[in-house]
Amino acid sequence: MGVSKLDILYRRLLLTKLFIRGWGRPEDLKRLFEFRKMIGNRERCQNLVSSDYPVHIDKVEEQSDCKILDGHFVSPMAHYVPGIMPIESVIARFQFIVPKEWNSRYRPVCIHLAGTGDHHYWRRRTLMARPMIKEARMASLLLENPYYILLKPKDQVRSSLKNVSDLFVMGGALILESAALLHWLEREGYGPLGMTGISMGGHMASLAVSNWPKPMPLIPCLSWSTASGVFTTGVLSKSINWRELEKQYYTQTVYEEEIIHMLEYCGTDSFKMGHEFMKHFPSNEDKLTNLNLVSRTLNLDMRDQVVSPKHAECHHSGKASISATSKGQLLQDTAKVERLNQTLTTNKSCFASYNPQSLHLLSREQRRSNLQKESLIFMKGVMDECTHVANFSVPVDPSLIIVVQAKEDAYIPRTGVRSLQEIWPGCEIRYLEGGHISAYLFKQGLFRQAIYDAFERFLHKYAN
């Protein structure tokens, strides 16, 4: 399946750059990776936010068909990783849109997390929450993203996060903030409760639901299993300040000497395939301009991933096991298996062979090429560590998950990435024609229908 030309054109029209200041402070990355281990385990994470966590309502506005409540609370992230959030983001803000009348004895609420660039509430309120009031008498709670609008650092331009680490701070904050709001909604007598989001919002909703200890409808729209492809092979990768990332990776050895060793994710689409990437990346490539080339060099053109028994041991208990298809493939193609096993069982020390101290002996073109390779692999590694859903608990009931994905999405690559159906057995995936932008503009009705279907599925299965 090809990619949407509209997605590519739309990205070219946007001039903003991502991660203009680089990776973020190494000490911040270390703290975030340690925190990821905590929130990646539901048994540990579910106790981080108490059931009586304080939430405050600031304003109530009565309208003809609904009430609109604005509220705030202190982000729990500020308690667990103090000092890592910008001061502007410490106070989380939300808007709660409640129908004047309900269709039944239930009072369903869906939390909507924001996608990239979705500042404030008006877009989600207009395109999703208002129609949901009219169509299904369903309430919507819109949580503002950290780093957006009132929560945006003063020196940040629009949605352009300054550091790679900012994305991980945002994700950790949204997981804990969602838990605080879910507890509050339960205290107020609402239910059933579910979560959704479009693009980045869908991915953040997936991570939040993975840590909720009860069955919950989840409807991630235009998102997939990891953000690593978004920032290495998707069209957004063209907006990244790679020069600064490469420079920092070269000048600060802490990234390869310490931080790489903290990366634990080892699925079949792991960054440990980087050894194969090193072998095949063309030495004369000066810019990351060909996304298909990047996909090939990251081994993303392999339709069926296989994994060695030794590698399978690195999965945490509860992760999806190797499929029968993969086992069959293992027997069919010995040469391919040997090459992959060598790649997949290579430990993190493979990066140490590319010592920045020795790069001065190479030609300028070779140094540039090697830095590109290592920076791209490191980006995949840190993104998989903090965003891959396989690094988090499986939601309590995957049958309540309906994923809506665009077939030609150039923002969210699926090639070479583990399928959500493999990670969440029993979930449903609905594919739409077209790409990311066209789906966002014209398929909101299908997103809402998926929400209604998931909530109906919950009531059919769990209603008293």
Swiss-Prot record:
Pfam families: ABHD18. Glycans are attached at residue 341. The keyword Coiled coil does not apply. Residues 1-24 form the signal peptide. It comes from the Eukaryota. GO terms for cellular component: extracellular region. It is found in: Secreted. Keywords: Glycoprotein, Secreted, Signal. Belongs to the AB hydrolase superfamily. This is Protein ABHD18. The lineage of its organism: Eukaryota, Metazoa, Chordata, Craniata, Vertebrata.
